[in-house]
Amino acid sequence: MSEKMDALPDIEQIHAAAARIAPHARVTPVMCSAVLDALTGAELYFKCEHLQRGGAFKFRGACNAVWSLTDEEAAKGVVTHSSGNHGAALALAARTRGIAAHVVVPAGAVRSKVAAIRTYGATVHECAPTQAARDAMAADIGQRTGARMVHPFTDPAVIAGQGTAALELIREVGGLDIIVTPVGGGGLVSGSALAVAGSGQRIHVIGAEPSGAADAYESLRRGSRVLEIVPDTICDGLRATIGQPNFELLRAHDVQVLLVDDAETMAAMRLVWERLKILIEPSCATVLAAVLRHREVFAGHRVGLVLSGGNVDLDEIRFATGASR
């Protein structure tokens, strides 16, 4: 995919994506908590993308990409590389169109997420846990099968699809001051920035990033993309390096990135479990962790938080396995 800015979507394409995915994607609800409002000093509106099909917002982008293909392109299938949620989303989206999906998965990926990819009907190809290995295997599959590459976060159709979550949130909750999303490769936060820019409303977009995978934060601070950071975080969905087009969109739309550590993220996840009575994954909890750590940024404001996913490995939770304290 070209990484030029003119290859990226605009608000019209986000609206087109919303119409394209409407027969397949869910309009997810918004939840509130008076306790969490009091704790943070802000009005919080949680956009429940963990209830999206496939358990994550990523179905939006994958679905838009799959249904943007011509019949001739679709007949050859799709391919991607993913450690979990995007792979499952693409597998499910491909199933809605009745086409083949190939997902390259690095060794050591979360077992429950790999199982979901298989459940949705994709062919899983395991590779070494490096970006070079992922790229090489996906390219080889594409060359052999003719399958169309759907990149997890730099594909324009994926970015447009991810932007539909913020588009819905803006429609569902009036008068928002801030929207917070997690930051990994940057598809959700850049799509959200585009949706906000096209809405005509003065809403500040903020990304929440693990301090152990702070490439987006450092890239914005230095003014150029930082590639040398080796991620060390429990947030498996946020270990990807920010994409070049995504980084450029963050700069163009004055997106701020705030850092949170894993302990803060896990504490925020527990708060969501306790107060909203919903199951979210660690990557998703970074948004509340950011509000709690950086109260001065959010206090007194109406804040939309995108709960990006709920694909938790239940085998890792003690009460689900019958383990005692």
Regions found by a protein language model. Give the residues of each.
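PLP-dependent amino-acid enzyme catalytic core
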Residues: M1-R325
